[in-house]
């Protein structure tokens, strides 16, 4: 869930508020905050599937960013006795945004290949740290507003056109890695990180997703460079919106790059 102004909304992929409107209202000064899904909501959601005789594999937003995975686990335990013939399995993605979207894309393929729910869960837990998440932001306003950097640092950073480059570590936390001066340089560097870490290097033949918050031109510039450097990609780079939960913290002006690679470190 997220708050925009004085109203609470579900994070429903832009259905309640279109993404462009959401980011425009943030840019105009409306405040945002987020809250995790509670146990009762998970109970109601999971039970809808269990009543139909279905098993559930729930893959959660990183525990390094949200406590929702704990609510999901409690709900799964509470339902186990009531529905002994079906199961709810919960996986901590240790990922976010289209990073764990890329994981879900692979898990759906495994399901469609006939793998059991346990086999799909085991793959997720064994491979989740091979999904790289790299982010940069061209607008420090919302990092200052959220208290992640000081007003002074934000002022100097903006004056010097500093773009922070972050990634997600092996515990699912977002970690600042570099401060890069200028948009062109940070676009080059984020693709350089893919060159350094992608499975197979320039021969990488997996999928690549990009997410962005109201900065399609920047996202397209990253995608074009990725497609130039990695000619064997599985299809074109897919560009999505950063959702409202993550976007509430980043604000507009953030681009995120996701791909399969070596194991993430601390």
Question: What kind of feature is each model-predicted range?
Answer:
Residues 1-9, 64-68, 72-77, 83, ...:
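Mixed-charge interfacial surface used for oligomerization/domain docking
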Residues 1-41:
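N-terminal glycine-rich anion-binding loop in soluble enzyme alpha/beta folds
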Residues 27-63, 70, 74, 121:
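Glycine-rich phosphate- or other oxyanion-binding loops that anchor nucleotides, phosphorylated ligands
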């Amino acid at each position: 869930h997220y708050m925009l102004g004085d109203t609470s909304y579900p994070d429903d992929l832009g259905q309640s508020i279109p993404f462009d409107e959401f980011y425009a209202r943030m840019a105009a000064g409306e405040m945002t905050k987020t809250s995790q899904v509670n146990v009762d909501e998970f109970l109601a959601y999971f039970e809808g599937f269990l009543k139909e005789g279905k098993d559930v594999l729930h893959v959660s937003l990183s525990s390094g960013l949200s406590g929702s995975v704990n609510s999901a686990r409690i709900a799964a335990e509470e339902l186990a006795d009531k529905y002994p013939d079906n199961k709810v399995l919960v996986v901590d993605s240790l990922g976010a945004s289209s990073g764990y979207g890329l994981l879900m894309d692979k898990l759906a393929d495994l399901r469609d290949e006939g793998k059991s729910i346990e086999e799909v869960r085991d793959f997720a837990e064994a491979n989740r740290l091979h999904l790289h998440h790299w982010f940069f932001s061209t607008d420090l306003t919302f990092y200052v507003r959220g208290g992640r950097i000081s007003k002074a640092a934000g002022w100097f950073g903006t004056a010097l056109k500093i773009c922070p480059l972050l990634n997600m570590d092996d515990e699912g936390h977002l970690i600042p890695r570099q401060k890069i001066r200028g948009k062109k340089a940070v676009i080059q560097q984020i693709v350089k990180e893919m060159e350094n870490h992608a499975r197979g290097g320039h021969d990488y033949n997996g999928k690549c997703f990009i997410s962005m918050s109201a900065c399609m031109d920047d996202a397209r510039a990253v995608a074009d460079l990725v497609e130039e450097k990695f000619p064997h990609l599985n299809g074109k780079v897919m560009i999505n919106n950063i959702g409202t939960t993550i976007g509430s913290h980043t604000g507009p002006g953030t681009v995120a790059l996701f791909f399969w690679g070596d194991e993430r470190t601390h």
